Amino acid sequence: MALDKDQFIEDLKGASITDLNDLVKAIEDEFGVSAAAPVAAAGAAGGAAEAKTSFNVELTSGGSAKIKVIKAVREITGAGLKDAKDMVDNAPSVIKEDVSEDEANELKAKLEEAGATVEVK
């Protein structure tokens, strides 16, 4: 008897959670495998392949036009003059955390236009 994949999937859809759990345990016993290991490996690989949705904008160097960069940092962060100067002087420093890719690229362009070296991570 040939196993029809589509019919098998339909049967699985109709099964209860308890039945599916018993099926997984039976497969583990029959083939000597663990469902936990492949799931963890697939999860780790899938996590790396997923598109990143949250980015950090990191100032790696203030460049030679520090005053322009400090002004840009103040505008982006809303920080005071001393805090913005400290961020530029103590580079590398994270200027903005957990922003969208578009916003991160806009901020990077603005900082680079002022003369800074920036990385989006």
From Swiss-Prot:
GO molecular function, one term: structural constituent of ribosome
GO cellular-component term (any): cytosolic large ribosomal subunit
GO BP: any one term: translation
CDD domains tied to this protein: Ribosomal_L7_L12 (cd00387)
Range of residues in the leader sequence: none
Gene3D superfamilies: 3.30.1390.10, Single helix bin (1.20.5.710)
Keywords annotated in UniProt: Ribonucleoprotein, Ribosomal protein
InterPro entries: Ribosomal_bL12 (IPR000206), Ribosomal_bL12_C (IPR013823), Ribosomal_bL12_C/ClpS-like (IPR014719), Ribosomal_bL12_oligo (IPR008932), Ribosomal_bL12_oligo_N_sf (IPR036235)
NCBIfam families: L12
Protein family according to the UniProt entry: Belongs to the bacterial ribosomal protein bL12 family.
Function per UniProt: Forms part of the ribosomal stalk which helps the ribosome interact with GTP-bound translation factors. Is thus essential for accurate translation.
Assembly behavior: Homodimer. Part of the ribosomal stalk of the 50S ribosomal subunit. Forms a multimeric L10(L12)X complex, where L10 forms an elongated spine to which 2 to 4 L12 dimers bind in a sequential fashion. Binds GTP-bound translation factors.
Name of the protein described by the UniProt record: Large ribosomal subunit protein bL12
